[in-house]
Swiss-Prot record:
One of its GO terms (cellular component) is cytosol. One of its GO terms (biological process) is purine nucleotide biosynthetic process. It comes from the Bacteria. The lineage of its organism: Bacteria, Bacillati, Bacillota, Clostridia, Thermoanaerobacterales. CDD domains: NAD_bind_m-THF_DH_Cyclohyd. Its EC number is 1.5.1.5, 3.5.4.9. One of its GO terms (molecular function) is methylenetetrahydrofolate dehydrogenase (NADP+) activity. NADP(+) binds at G161, R162, S163, S186, I227. Homodimer. Pfam families: THF_DHG_CYH, THF_DHG_CYH_C. Pathway: One-carbon metabolism; tetrahydrofolate interconversion. This is Bifunctional protein FolD. It comes from Caldanaerobacter subterraneus subsp. tengcongensis (strain DSM 15242 / JCM 11007 / NBRC 100824 / MB4).
Length: 280
């Protein structure tokens, strides 16, 4: 049986080249605003890495920093960016500080600039089958699966995780691909019973080594969207070493879903730019 470790960086680079080419054809740089509140160091690193990725394809990006006490200023800036014709995409760097009104963020962000699809409006459109945007990580996961060439129709897909930004959307997207979908979560009894039935297994629970090799069947396609830091190293939710020789396709962490998610931020920013051009 064919076995392959999926190279997310290679897939990401192809997407970036496509985005860069389209931007050059437009002859105008899209602009992305990233709003971040609080002093979480990892969030700062993620935000700055997004800026670098944007610059590599010709997108202008700026990070707006706010202290955890500047909630009013945060929302004032968000509303101004909503109306700014020169700002095409807006991202909110999560998590926001405790006490921030996250529901207000979901209600306030301009849906046509909401490149990570966090607004209530965009989530509704996604589940109605008429999305303006698809959340970046679920979009990356589906792109990776399509890139394998595996026919998803009729496959049993198991998703571990039910967050609004990852688990639920990716389950919906897999349904759209005509998979039979099972969603597992922290209250699921006998997780291994479900994972052993999966033709496609998407792990997005945020718990290191949640899935081991003895919990999957031979030939499974495993997409690991987990990010866990342990003793200074990054790990996924699946025990890669015990799974890599059993899976037909598997994403490593790091180097799997992460780079493709970053590329999808760029792609969605380009889509937001196109919406703005159409409205002129």
């Amino acid at each position: 049986m064919k076995r392959m470790i999926i190279d997310g960086k290679e897939i990401s680079n192809r997407i970036k080249e496509e985005v860069k080419r389209e931007i050059q054809e437009f002859g105008y740089k899209p602009r992305l605003a990233i709003l971040m509140a609080g002093d979480d160091e990892s969030s700062k690193v993620y935000a700055n890495s997004k800026v670098k990725a944007c610059e590599s394809v010709g997108i202008e990006a700026k990070v707006y920093y706010f202290s955890e006490k500047e909630e009013d200023k945060f929302f004032d800036t968000l509303e101004k960016l909503n109306e700014d014709k020169d700002t095409h995409g807006i991202m909110i760097e999560m998590p926001l500080p405790k006490g921030f009104d996250v529901d207000k963020v979901y209600d306030t962000i301009n849906p046509y600039k909401d490149v990570d699809c966090i607004s209530n409006y965009n989530m509704g459109r996604l589940f109605a089958g008429k999305p303006l945007f698809v959340p970046c990580t679920p979009k990356a996961i589906i792109h990776i699966l399509e890139n394998t060439g595996v026919d998803l129709e009729g496959k049993h897909a198991v998703v571990i995780g039910r967050s609004n930004i990852l688990g639920k959307p990716v389950a919906k997207l897999l349904l759209d691909k005509n998979c039979t979908v099972t969603v597992c979560h922290s209250k699921t009894k006998d997780l291994a019973y479900h994972t052993k039935q999966a033709d496609v297994l998407v792990v997005a629970a945020g718990k290191m080594n949640l899935v081991r090799g003895d919990m999957v069947k031979e030939g499974v396609v495993l997409i690991d969207a987990g990010i866990n830091v342990h003793e200074g190293k990054i790990y996924g939710d699946a025990d890669f070493e015990s799974i890599k020789d059993k899976a037909s396709y598997v994403t490593p962490v790091p180097g799997g879903v992460g780079p493709v998610t970053t590329a999808m931020i760029l792609k969605n920013t380009l889509e937001a730019f196109k919406y703005a051009v159409k409205s002129l």
